[in-house]
Design a protein with these regions (language model features):
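Core catalytic lobe of class I
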Residues: 1-24, 31-282, 328-335
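S-adenosyl-L-methionine
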Residues: 21-54, 284-325
Length: 335
């Protein structure tokens, strides 16, 4: 069997795994016992989260990214999740979330992804253990329309910490570059924007509304057949803002490995737990590929570009973001 073996168009770049690659990739995936005997740094652990979480060292992770099953009935290539009542879903979250929080360092950060249906349950459970700093809304621009409802094109990402007066947040590492539609000049000179032969652009501070990130699709080399894969660009913002090089990024629902791949590309360590062996192999191949390909689509020379600017990024005729002091210890936003 070839993993991800479907009939695909010639230009389709979705990840596949050949039969010959499986032994090599399997050696990159740890079982529960292997991981616990040799350490968790830079590991993919193929196990049920509840079977292994107690053995993960407490306070080991500087950043935790959580993309759990939403409260929807879905088949993850043989591993199914069934929708339940809101109360039952909250109890499901508590079963593992409290334990996951124990793995967060005292000045660490946790992000959790959710959709409109489960996000209120997530907010409630997160607040029982951590302090919520903000909610990011990601406009993912994908999803089927409906005749009797609005198309679901948004997801939430909850931003939470243990200590509101002591957590790392580097906003200068996640600046965004956008086209200037109505450029303003002061004495004939561009004001707060750059004028280039490829267009007018402004480097700005990011907000909590993200509309510059596409869901992975068939022409992107990061794409897999995972039904709910998150984009590398999305996780790159979280990793760059809330961790330092050499920090450990922990993902208890690794899926096809986006958090681990991004961590490696950005010189962080990773640890991920995933129950589906096939997904673990996809993650392993993506990590192997990242040894020679560090590109994160939409992130170029230390700045995040808006959609549909790839050709301009490659031309490189623009100003890089100014060099700024990147150490930021944030006060509470709610005091």
């Amino acid at each position: 069997m070839v993993l991800g073996d479907k009939k695909r168009a010639e230009r389709n770049r979705t990840l596949t795994i050949s039969q010959d690659e499986i032994p090599t990739l399997s050696r990159m995936v740890s079982s529960k016992n292997d991981a616990l005997s040799s350490g968790i740094t830079d590991t993919i652990i193929n196990a049920d989260l509840m079977d292994v979480i107690d053995a993960i060292p407490d306070k080991c992770a500087n950043l935790i990214i959580v993309d759990p099953p939403y409260n929807l009935s879905k088949d993850f290539h043989g591993v199914t999740f069934n929708a339940m009542s809101s109360d039952s879903y909250e109890e499901y979250l508590r079963e593992w979330f409290y334990k996951v929080c124990d793995k967060l360092s005292d000045n660490g950060t946790l992000y959790m992804c959710g959709d409109w249906k489960c996000t209120s349950s997530m907010q409630k459970v997160i607040s029982e253990r951590l302090s919520i700093i903000n909610r990011i809304t990601w406009q993912r621009e994908k999803g089927r329309g409906a005749m009797s409802n609005w198309k679901n094109g948004m997801e939430d990402i909850w931003f939470a910490v243990k200590k509101t007066n002591d957590y790392y947040f580097n906003v200068e590492a996640v600046m965004t570059k956008r086209r200037v539609l109505a450029p303003y000049r002061d004495n004939g000179k561009p004001k707060d924007w750059d004028e280039t032969e490829n267009g007018n652009f402004r480097t700005t501070y990011p907000s909590n509304f993200w509309d510059d990130i596409s869901v992975p699709f068939w022409s992107m080399p990061e794409n897999t057949d995972h039904p709910t894969q998150k984009p590398e660009k999305l996780y790159a913002k979280l990793v760059l803002a809330s961790s330092k090089p050499g920090d450990l990024v922990f993902d208890p629902f690794l899926g096809s490995g986006t958090s681990a791949v991004v961590a490696k590309k950005l010189n962080r360590h990773y640890c991920g737990i995933e129950i589906n062996k096939e997904y673990c192999l996809w993650a392993a191949k993506r990590i192997m590929n990242s040894e020679t390909d560090k590109e994160i689509q939409g992130y170029q020379d230390g700045v995040f570009w808006e959609r549909n600017t790839l050709n301009i990024q490659k031309k490189g005729n623009y100003k890089k973001p100014r060099e700024l002091n990147t150490v930021c210890q944030q006060p509470s936003l709610f005091s």
